C-alpha cells in the first residue's frame, strides 16, 4: 500500500507542477498513470498475486486512488479549457457599436407584381378570381370556345398534346367555360394562370401567364367593355394613355378587337385582345344568347410587365438573374 500512496502522491504533484496550460501535457500524465502500461494499470494487474481474502480490499483501495487522481486530472482539464476559452473570447471580442449584417429580403417576381395589380383593380369592380386545370381537354380548350376540329385557328396555338383528347392549355379561356357551366348570370370573373405554347424566342416562351376576364349579364355591351379597358390601362400604367381599338378576329368573340396604347416613342403597342362573347359559346354552356350577352378580355401578363417596366427580352422573367429581379423590389 505504500507503493499505492507513493504513486498517488507522485501523480498529484505532477499535475500540480504543470504550468503550460497544455491539454497535451495532461494527456501525457493520463497515459503515464492510466494507459496500458501505466502505474495504476500495473497495480491492478498485480492483484493476481494478492491472496483471495485480501484481494477485494486491496482492489477497492486501488480504485479509490485511481478515482482521486482522475478527479484531479478532470478538474485541471476543465480549468485549462475555461482559461483557453476566455483567452479566445478576449481575442474575438465583438464591437457592439458596429452595424449588424442586414438580412437580405426577397421580393415579388415582376410577373406576380403585375398579376396582383390586375387582380386588385378588377376586384374593386366586383370581379372574382376563378382557376382551372392546366392539363385541359380538347373540349374546354377548343370545342366549347367555337374552335372545332380542323378549324384553322387551332394551328395558331402551337399546342402541346398528351394524346388526342388531353393537352397543356393554350389559353385560360377554358376557365370561362367551366365557370359558365356551374354559375348562372350575372357573371364577373377573372382567370389568371399559366398557359403553354410550343414557341421560344425573344418575345415568346413555352410557358407564360394570361389573365382573362368574363362578364355576362342581360345588358353587357361593347361600350361598357371599352370604358372598362380605358380605365384599367390608365390605372395600370399610371398615365393618361391614348388607347385605340382595332377590329380583329377571335373564334370565341364577335365582334372582336385588339387594344393598343401609344408608346413613348410615338408608336402603337398592342396590349390585349377582347370582344363580345360569341353566341355559340353561350349556347355551348346552356346560356340563351337572346337573353344574355357578355364580353371577354385576354391579356398576356408578361406583355403588360414588359411594357410597364421597359423590359426588352421576355426570357429575362424566367432566367432567375438576381441582377434583373432586384430591380423590382
Curated annotation (Swiss-Prot):
Keyword Cytoplasm: yes
Domain of life: Bacteria
Cofactor(s) this protein cannot do without: Mg(2+)
Alphabetically ordered keywords of this record: Aminoacyl-tRNA synthetase, ATP-binding, Cytoplasm, Ligase, Magnesium, Metal-binding, Nucleotide-binding, Protein biosynthesis
Main location: cytoplasm
CDD domains from the UniProt entry: PheRS_alpha_core
Binding site for Mg(2+): 254
Annotated disulfide bonds: none
GO molecular function, one term: phenylalanine-tRNA ligase activity
Enzyme Commission identifier(s): 6.1.1.20
PROSITE patterns documented for this protein: AA_TRNA_LIGASE_II
InterPro entries documented for this protein: aa-tRNA-synth_II, aa-tRNA-synth_II/BPL/LPL, Phe-tRNA-synth_IIc_asu, Phe-tRNA_ligase_II_N, Phe_tRNA_ligase_alpha1_bac, Phenylalanyl-tRNA_Synthase, tRNA-bd_arm
Recorded catalytic activity of this chain's protein: tRNA(Phe) + L-phenylalanine + ATP = L-phenylalanyl-tRNA(Phe) + AMP + diphosphate + H(+)
GO cellular component: cytoplasm
Entry's localization field: Cytoplasm
Keyword match Zinc: no
Co-factor remark: Binds 2 magnesium ions per tetramer.
Family that this chain belongs to: Belongs to the class-II aminoacyl-tRNA synthetase family. Phe-tRNA synthetase alpha subunit type 1 subfamily.
Subunit structure: Tetramer of two alpha and two beta subunits.
Record PANTHER family: PHENYLALANINE--TRNA LIGASE, MITOCHONDRIAL, PHENYLALANYL-TRNA SYNTHETASE
Protein name according to UniProt: Phenylalanine--tRNA ligase alpha subunit
Upper lineage: Bacteria, Pseudomonadati, Pseudomonadota, Gammaproteobacteria, Pasteurellales
Gene name tied to this protein: pheS
Amino acid at each position: 500500500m505504500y507503493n499505492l500512496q507513493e504513486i498517488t502522491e507522485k501523480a498529484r504533484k505532477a499535475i500540480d507542477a504543470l504550468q503550460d496550460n497544455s491539454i497535451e501535457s495532461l494527456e501525457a500524465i493520463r497515459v503515464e498513470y492510466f494507459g496500458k502500461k501505466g502505474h495504476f494499470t500495473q497495480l491492478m494487474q498485480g492483484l493476481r498475486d494478492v491472496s483471495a481474502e485480501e484481494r477485494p480490499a486491496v482492489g477497492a483501495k486501488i480504485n479509490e486512488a485511481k478515482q482521486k487522481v482522475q478527479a484531479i486530472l478532470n478538474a485541471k482539464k476543465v480549468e485549462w479549457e475555461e482559461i483557453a476559452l476566455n483567452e479566445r473570447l478576449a481575442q474575438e471580442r465583438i464591437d457592439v457599436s458596429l452595424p449588424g449584417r442586414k438580412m437580405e429580403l426577397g421580393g415579388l417576381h415582376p410577373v406576380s407584381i403585375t398579376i396582383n395589380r390586375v387582380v386588385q383593380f378588377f376586384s374593386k369592380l366586383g370581379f372574382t378570381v376563378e382557376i382551372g386545370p392546366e392539363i385541359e381537354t380538347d373540349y374546354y380548350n377548343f370545342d366549347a370556345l367555337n374552335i372545332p376540329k380542323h378549324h384553322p385557328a387551332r394551328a395558331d396555338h402551337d399546342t402541346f398534346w398528351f394524346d388526342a383528347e388531353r393537352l397543356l392549355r393554350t389559353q385560360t379561356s377554358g376557365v370561362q367555360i367551366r365557370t359558365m357551366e356551374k354559375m348562372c348570370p350575372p357573371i364577373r370573373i377573372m382567370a389568371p394562370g399559366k398557359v403553354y405554347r410550343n414557341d421560344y424566342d425573344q418575345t415568346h416562351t413555352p410557358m407564360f401567364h394570361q389573365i382573362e376576364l368574363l362578364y355576362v349579364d342581360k345588358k353587357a355591351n361593347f361600350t361598357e367593355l371599352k370604358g372598362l379597358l380605358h380605365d384599367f390601362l390608365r390605372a395600370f400604367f399610371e398615365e393618361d394613355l391614348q388607347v385605340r381599338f382595332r377590329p380583329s378576329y377571335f373564334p370565341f368573340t364577335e365582334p372582336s378587337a385588339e387594344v393598343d396604347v401609344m408608346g413613348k416613342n410615338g408608336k402603337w403597342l398592342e396590349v390585349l385582345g377582347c370582344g363580345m362573347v360569341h353566341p355559340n359559346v353561350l349556347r355551348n354552356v346552356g346560356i340563351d344568347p337572346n337573353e344574355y350577352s357578355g364580353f371577354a378580355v385576354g391579356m398576356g401578363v408578361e406583355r403588360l410587365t414588359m411594357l410597364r417596366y421597359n423590359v426588352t427580352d421576355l426570357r429575362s422573367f424566367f432566367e432567375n438573374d438576381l441582377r434583373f429581379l432586384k430591380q423590382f423590389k
